[in-house]
């Protein structure tokens, strides 16, 4: 029995990155030997065991053979005669097909170290094409390591494009698509994930609402980058700098979906694109089974982001109604989230990346003023039932009006 550290732990250590999870491969052992050594079996489809002390995963070396459609249609063979090289051959990328023995020696059967040095994401073998999920995984790795200047090998991108054209991605379940997307949204450069999907044709298959934005122009005065698809990826990049939250990043990604519905004769203007985009957000989220809290924020951002941009001239009643519409009284975090998505929208434009977004500050300040109005005073004043809500709203509007008169004085006619 020989045990090797494999995959991501070896890769990240060689890159000088923190190692989070460790996975191990066991060569020359049977399930019975593992159980007798105190390991706990957790895998049904193939033998995976938990170490009795560290609880890290130890998998018996195995080979896989395509036996059906999609990413689950594989027949697994695990036995003592399976070699380490055979096990590594089934992995997706060469940089993930590295192993390390107990003396620290690196086993590199497929050029993974060279590709790490060259910052290249390259598939191990033609068997890559048997698993459509790998298209999304490679896009995610491209996003994860974009700050290290990694790129996808031409032959790997060509294979991903061929897999997409062959309809392989249609076998992916919504849950797996969302899981990969969610993981990609947590990376430092999530926009790269969607750019790679577009490069191989997968964006049109998995996110047609986003793909439809490319080639749609916006007024050059406000959008020097002109193309709405490019703007969308720029805003996502900016959102990633402003917030680590998947909710904020996904909402930013979806904020302009309505522009894809504008008839060409109205280009480059997109009147009413916010409310129009809400249904598209609902469509994506229903299709991919996106969690409700993420969906709800994305819908609100699509509907109200343009309103936030005009915040200095909004009437106090409109501001309080906005807080009602986003349910800020019960979910106060939404104020900050919407401030950040709106800022990402403004700064996600060519030449505007470093601009100040005063509307966000005003939104936050107005919220502090409105929420400081005590409900207790209204109740103690004798208001009952629906009257409480009405009076509370009046007092909030007045408080915001008093603040706004000092903070945002408007020129007199």
Swiss-Prot record:
Cofactor note: Magnesium is required for nucleotidyltransferase activity.
Residues binding ATP: 8, 11, 91, 137, 140
Cofactor(s) in the UniProt record: Mg(2+); Ni(2+)
CDD domains per UniProt: HDc, NT_ClassII-CCAase
Residues engaged in binding Mg(2+): 21, 23
Binding sites annotated in the UniProt record for CTP: 8, 11, 91, 137, 140
Name used for this protein in its record: Multifunctional CCA protein
Organism listed in the record: Enterobacter sp. (strain 638)
Lineage: Bacteria, Pseudomonadati, Pseudomonadota, Gammaproteobacteria, Enterobacterales
Gene this chain is encoded by: cca
């Amino acid at each position: 029995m020989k045990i090797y550290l494999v995959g991501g732990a070896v890769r990240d250590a060689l890159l000088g990155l923190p190692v989070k999870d460790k996975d191990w491969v066991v060569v020359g052992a049977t399930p019975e030997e593992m159980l007798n050594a105190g390991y706990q079996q957790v895998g049904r489809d193939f033998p995976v065991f938990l170490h009795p002390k560290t609880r890290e995963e130890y998998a018996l070396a195995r080979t896989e053979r395509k036996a059906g459609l999609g990413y689950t249609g594989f027949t697994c063979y695990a036995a003592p005669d399976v070699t380490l090289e055979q096990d590594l051959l089934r992995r997706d990328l060469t940089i993930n097909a590295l192993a390390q023995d107990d003396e620290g020696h690196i086993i590199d059967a497929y050029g993974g170290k060279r590709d790490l040095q060259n910052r290249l994401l390259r598939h191990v073998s033609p068997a890559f094409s048997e698993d459509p999920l790998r298209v999304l995984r490679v896009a995610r790795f491209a996003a994860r390591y974009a700050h290290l200047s990694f790129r996808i090998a031409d032959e790997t991108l060509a294979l991903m494009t061929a897999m997409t054209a062959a309809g392989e991605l249609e076998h992916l379940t919504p849950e797996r698509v969302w899981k990969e997307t969610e993981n990609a949204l947590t990376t430092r450069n999530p926009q790269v994930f969607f750019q790679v999907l577009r490069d191989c044709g997968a964006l049109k298959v998995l996110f047609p609402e986003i793909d439809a934005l490319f080639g749609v122009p916006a007024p050059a005065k406000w959008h020097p980058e002109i193309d709405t698809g490019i703007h969308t990826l720029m805003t996502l990049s900016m959102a990633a700098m402003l917030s680590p939250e998947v909710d904020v990043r996904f909402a930013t990604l979806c904020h302009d979906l309505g522009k894809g519905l504008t008839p060409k004769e109205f280009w480059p203007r997109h009147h009413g694109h916010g409310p129009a985009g809400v249904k598209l957000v609902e469509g994506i989220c229903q299709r991919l089974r996106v969690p409700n809290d993420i969906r709800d924020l994305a819908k609100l951002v699509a509907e109200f982001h343009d309103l936030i941009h005009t915040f200095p001239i909004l009437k106090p009643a409109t501001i309080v109604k906005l807080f009602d519409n986003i349910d800020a009284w019960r979910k106060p975090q939404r104020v900050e989230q919407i401030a950040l998505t709106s800022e990402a929208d403004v700064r996600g434009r060519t030449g505007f990346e470093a601009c100040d977004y005063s509307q966000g500050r005003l939104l936050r300040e107005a919220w502090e003023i409105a929420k400081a109005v005590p409900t207790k005073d209204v109740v103690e004043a004798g208001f009952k039932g629906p009257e409480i809500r009405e009076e509370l709203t009046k007092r909030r509007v007045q408080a915001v009006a008093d603040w706004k008169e000092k903070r945002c004085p408007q020129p007199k006619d």
